[in-house]
Amino acid sequence: CRSMTMIRCSVAAVRARQFRFIGFSLHTFINIFFLLPLKAYALCTLSNSDWLSRGSAAKATGKGGKLDAIQDPVAASSPRESQENEAPLRRHNLARDATRSMAYDGICTDQ
């Protein structure tokens, strides 16, 4: 049935001298041989973690714009090497000191 439709569209395109009728015939081939396999591949690799995202691409870009290897602290050869690669963590004391009180405008005042 589809082959007859494709033949009819090709004949109509030649008779009318408008090649937009061939687009219908080509749409079938494009859909079956290109779009469907591409969709299947995308679904199969949906859980793949190798896809780059904006966050990992920004981290991997070096000064010269080239991609550098991302150093994984878990994959380091020794614990000391992984500690050298990590940035120091700053701990903020979020609890207020009992000797200070907050003024009405948000400025700390000593009592």
UniProtKB/Swiss-Prot annotation:
Region annotation (Disordered) maps to: 56-98
Enzyme class, top EC level, equals transferase
A Gene Ontology CC term for this entry?
plasma membrane
Compositional bias, Basic and acidic residues, is annotated for 81-98
Q: How does it sit in the membrane?
A: Peripheral membrane protein
EC nos: 2.4.1.-
Major location category of this protein = membrane
UniProt keywords (A-Z) are: Cell membrane, Glycosyltransferase, Membrane, Nodulation, Plasmid, Transferase
Q: Where in the cell is it found?
A: Cell membrane
- Mention one GO molecular function: glycosyltransferase activity
Function noted in UniProt:
Involved in the synthesis of Nod factor, a sulfated N-acyl-beta-1,4-tetrasaccharide of N-acetylglucosamine which initiates a series of events in the host plant species leading eventually to nodulation.
Which family is this protein grouped under?
Answer: Belongs to the NodC/HAS family.
Q: What is this protein called?
A: N-acetylglucosaminyltransferase
Protein source organism: Rhizobium tropici
Which gene is the coding source of this polypeptide chain?
Answer: nodC
